[in-house]
């Protein structure tokens, strides 16, 4: 009888250890699935620093939330001063956008944009009207380069669903992957390191000059609860 009791106690102890190991493994997998990525960029215009742009990408299982905030001050044609402020929040499920809100201020003009999924389709609220866009919408998600490969991308600042093209090349000299997003009137040049992390952005702006984003390690922007 004593041997039987010892055997049962040993079995219960093994079961408890197994349960603890299983919980530890589950916690580890959950930690891998849930992650936060921060992208801080110094912004320059014609090689002159004009501000910053910050992206925080939070992943929880299949859901992804992106908070972005930008601040830029520059002069156009040596005369016109431009003050630019922008904030946006995007919610994704898998690789399809579920909702977004944005607020953009240029000097004294402020623009609000939003959109969301309804009954399997994505609608953008534009000029106090709901505009049907598509069933699976992607934005200019530079932080997820694979999502740029689409026929149209949504600009969350303007609410426009823009036709795009994509070219991808590998630069052996720098070990960077270059992606060029083609738009109707310009191009956006992006560079990623060999781990797929976004490092730079460059685009020619009409009248204003060449806009360039350079990723930096230090934090940028004012203190913000979300950012």
What are these regions (language model features)?
Residues 2-4, 224-227:
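Amphipathic/hydrophobic helical signal segments and adjacent flexible N-terminal regions
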Residues 3-18:
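Bacterial N-terminal signal peptides that target proteins for export
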Residues 21-22:
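Residues marking helix boundaries in flexible regions
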Residues 25-28:
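N-terminal signal peptide c-region/cleavage motif recognized by signal peptidases
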Residues 34-36, 98-208, 213, 220-226:
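Solvent-exposed helix/loop surface patches that form functional interfaces
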Residues 35-117:
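N-terminal mature ectodomain segment of secretory-pathway/periplasmic proteins
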């Amino acid at each position: 009888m004593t041997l039987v009791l010892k055997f049962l106690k040993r079995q219960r102890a093994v079961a408890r250890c197994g349960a603890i190991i299983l919980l530890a493994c589950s916690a580890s997998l959950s930690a891998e699935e849930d992650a936060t990525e921060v992208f801080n960029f110094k912004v320059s215009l014609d090689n002159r620093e004009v501000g910053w742009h910050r992206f925080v990408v939070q992943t929880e299982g299949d859901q992804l939330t992106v908070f972005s905030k930008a601040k830029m001050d520059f002069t156009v044609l040596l005369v016109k001063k431009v003050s630019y402020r922008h904030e946006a929040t995007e919610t994704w499920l898998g690789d399809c956008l579920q909702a977004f809100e944005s607020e953009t201020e240029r000097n004294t003009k402020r623009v609000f944009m939003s959109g969301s999924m309804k009954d399997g389709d994505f609608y953008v609220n534009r000029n106090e009207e709901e505009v049907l866009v598509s069933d699976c919408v992607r934005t200019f998600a530079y932080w997820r380069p694979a999502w740029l490969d689409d026929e149209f991308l949504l600009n969350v600042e303007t609410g426009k669903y823009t036709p795009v093209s994509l070219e991808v090349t590998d630069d052996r000299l720098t070990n960077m992957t270059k992606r060029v997003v083609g738009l109707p009137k310009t191009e956006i040049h992006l560079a990623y390191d060999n781990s797929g992390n976004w490092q730079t952005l460059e685009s020619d702006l009409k009248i204003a000059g060449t806009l360039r984003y350079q990723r930096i390690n230090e934090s940028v922007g004012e203190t913000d609860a979300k950012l």
